């Protein structure tokens, strides 16, 4: 029988975050929707520019009602982004505080079961550091970094979809350019790291 290796790093953080699974999932979904909504103003600007170019140089032929509707669309996108991101942060903070509470209660109940000599040997400063600082780091990840990580993964996908839907040739050229830039950067930093 092989012992299962305890999880560390990001895997352990996700395991702790999943103790409040419904709130974490709600935060991830809302953060993804906020990332999508953040692109709505750019889409509205694209449609406005397209409409202006369609009638240029006779700008009097512009339909002001459609321009105003695109303006409202942009404003709605900004508002939706703010509301959805706020809701995502609310869910992630509720999950983080619930997880912190459980971690502290479990840690302190475990401390109550260990021999008194352990407390003397370790010292109160180290125990306080664990309860205050180390457990608080979990809150930073669940409450703040998790929604931002999700948005950081969703945003490039949404941007790629928008680029490809506007003009697949220019979108593909843009995506290939970004990929080449990442390859060059990794090669350059790889050599720099090898020198050290």
Predicted regions and their residues:
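Membrane-proximal cytosolic tails and large cytosolic loops of membrane proteins
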Residues: 1-7, 47, 58
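A short amphipathic helical element positioned immediately N-terminal to and/or at the very start
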Residues: 5-24, 126-127, 131
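Juxtamembrane helix-loop junctions of ABC transporter transmembrane domains
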Residues: 6, 37-45, 77-124, 128, ...
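Helix-boundary and loop/linker segments of multi-pass membrane transporters
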Residues: 13-20, 60-67, 133-134, 148-149
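Transmembrane helices of ABC transporter permease
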Residues: 19, 23-34, 147-196
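Transmembrane helix-loop-helix hairpins at lipid-water interfaces of multipass membrane proteins
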Residues: 24-84, 164-169
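Membrane-interfacial segments
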Residues: 49-57, 95-96, 100, 115, ...
């Amino acid at each position: 029988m092989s012992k299962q290796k305890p999880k560390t790093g990001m895997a352990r953080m996700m395991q702790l975050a999943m103790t409040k699974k419904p709130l974490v999932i709600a935060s991830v979904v809302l953060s993804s929707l906020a990332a999508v909504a953040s692109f709505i103003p750019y889409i509205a600007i694209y449609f406005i520019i397209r409409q202006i170019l369609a009638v240029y140089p006779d700008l009097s032929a512009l339909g002001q009602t459609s321009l105003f509707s695109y303006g409202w669309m942009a404003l709605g996108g900004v508002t939706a982004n703010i509301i959805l991101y706020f809701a995502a942060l609310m869910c992630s903070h509720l999950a983080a505080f619930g997880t912190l509470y459980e971690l502290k209660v479990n840690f302190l109940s475990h401390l109550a079961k260990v021999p008194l000599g352990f407390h003397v040997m370790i010292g109160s400063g180290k125990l306080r550091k664990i309860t205050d600082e180390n457990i608080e780091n979990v809150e930073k990840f669940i409450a703040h970094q998790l929604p931002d990580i999700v948005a950081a993964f969703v945003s490039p996908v949404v941007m790629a979809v928008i680029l490809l839907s506007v003009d697949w040739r220019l979108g593909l050229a843009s995506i290939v350019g970004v990929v080449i830039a990442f390859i060059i950067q990794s090669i350059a930093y790889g050599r720099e790291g090898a020198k050290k």
